[in-house]
């Protein structure tokens, strides 16, 4: 596997290990690679996960428990290309469960406030269609959706 020198680093209040365990359960070829824990006398309880390193389909990610100093915003999101509606539905439902929140255009926040985009693979093809009217219809449809629905995007692009 290729060594990555640049990786996302996520700041959690105290739920990094729980979040990482959940995320790796959603994606194939994903795993927790290491967990370092706070020692006695640290800023968090001894034994609590300090930094959790994990891979999402080969992408290395680090997550740290460091208290309620910072919160996630939409300025950072994970974008996931989903090839089928079943995959979109599965990921969407799992990520908004237990306190997550849907947003517009395929965006959502998970229960920890981290933003995700669940995007059908065909969307880029529709948006880049040389028939600019077809592309505009697909874009207009997407702008009105919460969870993206492939059949509706294609129907809109086709003028149906």
Language-model features: locations:
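Vicinal oxygen chelate
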Residues: 12, 16, 26, 56-60, ...
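Gly/Ser-enriched beta-turn/beta-hairpin loop segments
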Residues: 44, 69-70
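Core segments of cupin and vicinal oxygen chelate
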Residues: 9-58
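Extracellular, disulfide-bonded carbohydrate-recognition/adhesion ectodomains
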Residues: 1-2
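Acidic/histidine-enriched, glycine/proline-rich intrinsically disordered or flexible terminal extensions
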Residues: 134-160
